[in-house]
Structures are given as structure tokens and as C-alpha cells.
Amino acid sequence: MSKIILAIFLIVLCGLIFVTVDAMIDAPCKDNDDCDRFTEYCAIYADENGNEAGKRCEDAIGLLV
């Protein structure tokens, strides 16, 4: 019985970790510290006139591939 409870707890814990990390992608940011420090960076987006429209966290791993 305790092994089943432990297994359920570990599955839920792993799920929370992955959901929390993925939730930062496309989140608004002011600088790189607002994003996940190892896999994301704060990207600046511009409107059609070239003016800064905002900043969002982007996946840095995609830049390496």
C-alpha cells in the first residue's frame, strides 16, 4: 500500500516539475532573470515599424539545433 502511495506521489511531483518549467515559455519578462536560467532567454519582439513591442521568454535550446 505504501509503495502505491509513494509511486503516485512521485508521478505527481514529476508532472508538477515539467508543467512549471514549460509554463515559463512565452511568459512576459523584463530580463533573462525572469526566465528559466538554463534553457530560456528574454527575447525582444518588435512591431511592424521596428519599435519594441514587448519581451517574452524563448527556448534557448532551439537556437543550438
From Swiss-Prot:
Name the job this protein performs.
Endoparasitoid venom protein that interferes with the activation of host hemolymph prophenoloxidase. May act in conjunction with other venom proteins (such as Vn50), by competitive binding to the zymogen and thereby interrupting the enzyme.
- What's a GO cellular component annotated to this UniProt protein? extracellular region
Q: PTM comment for this protein?
A: Contains 2 disulfide bonds.
Protein's UniProt name: Venom protein Vn4.6
What are the boundaries of the signal sequence?
A: 1-23
The answer to whether UniProt assigns keyword Signal to this entry is yes
Subcellular location, record wording: Secreted
| Tissue-wise expression | Expressed by the venom gland.
Q: What else is known?
A: This species is an endoparasitoid, that contain symbiotic polydnaviruses (PDV) in its genome. PDVs, used to overcome the host defenses, are introduced into the body of the host larva at oviposition by the female wasp and have been shown to be essential for successful parasitism and development of the parasitoid inside the host. Interestingly, the coding region for Vn4.6 is located in the opposite direction upstream of a gene coding for a C.rubecula PDV structural protein (Crp32).
Which GO molecular function terms does the record list?
A: peptidase inhibitor activity
| Disulphide bridges | none
Primary localization class, coarse: secreted
UniProt entry keywords in alphabetical sequence: Disulfide bond, Protease inhibitor, Secreted, Signal
